[in-house]
Amino acid sequence: MTGVQTCALPICSLHEDQTRIQLGLNRNEFVLFYQPQVNLKSGEVVGAEALIRWQHPERGLVAPNDFLPLIEHHPLSVDLGEWVLNSALAQMTEWRRQGVLIPVSVNINSLHLRQLDFVERLEAILSLYPSIPNGQIELEIVETSSLENLEIVSETIDACRQLGVICSLDDFGTGYSSLSYLRRLPVEKLISILSFSTGSRRR
């Protein structure tokens, strides 16, 4: 034995990827795009969904499916989630200055939601943007991330509602415990990408 420490390639690669994502966050390489939500009858824009992309200096614009799974269970996902919240609220504040007031939804994973200080930190972030009225920011909880201890999650969602934040379940119908979530979590909206009857994708 030479005493040189090595590690399995997949583990090394994952660590390197996570380090690069952290560097990207520090360098402001992430951007938000806003997908409009339109009333089909009136054609009016009634909201927007904030979609994160990574403006990588070598790889170009990287889709979230290519980097978010790498940090789904890593504390870095909490940092990125807070960046998304701050960026979306800052954009909403700018739109409001221009006379545009529309609700915006952002995705949040279960690790972020289950942080013990989540509500406290959310309240602190909201306080930085006092011009945004209650009910204008929505948290789309990604159901495919493991939601543990539904009682605590339910209490957190209730606390968010007290702050004027709407909560919804994203990807509803993709997990084995979907109906349990529906019964036990006080969310205000369900966002389903699957049909219960046919199993066909909506998007």
What are these regions (language model features)?
Residues 26, 96, 161:
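Anion (oxyanion) recognition and catalysis
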Residues 2-9:
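Short, small-residue-biased leader/transition segments that mark boundaries at the very start
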Residues 13-70, 107, 169:
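Active-site core of bacterial EAL-family cyclic-dinucleotide phosphodiesterase domains
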Residues 125-200:
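The catalytic core of metal-dependent phosphodiesterases that act on cyclic dinucleotides
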Residues 12-16, 20, 26, 72, ...:
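Signal-transducing alpha-helical linker
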Residues 42-49, 75-152:
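Catalytic core of bacterial c-di-GMP phosphodiesterases, primarily the EAL and HD-GYP domains
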Residues 31, 101, 166:
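Residue-level detector of anion-binding/catalytic polar loops
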